[in-house]
């Protein structure tokens, strides 16, 4: 275990990815909080643009969208934005950190590779490089694990299921 200094820069990042790889990264500025409107402006609008560039024929049409049930994510304006742009929202049961790929895989993956940083800019740069260099197979493997977890969640009627997963 690496002991990190309390004086190292800390950062909040929103990462959007598909089974084929990274789609969009948004680093929150110091002091910035996520509310529904800046979630749309800083995350969902650029995400939608990126997907439309990656998939010029179909864009976001019929694309499944999963995020946890944090307050900004479940706001009516966010749901409306996603629906009007062709996304199908996959509901997230309350209190299920075992279901979100960011929680069960991505953030640990990033932390294991991070080196020490003395400033925010170098930390953002390294996080971006780590994310951009994750092999496509890793995203696919995580997507398959996510599907398994979704099935376990359904079987357990939305209750906690981490203890049922074969590590």
What is the meaning of each model-derived region?
Residues 1-167:
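Surface/interface recognition patches
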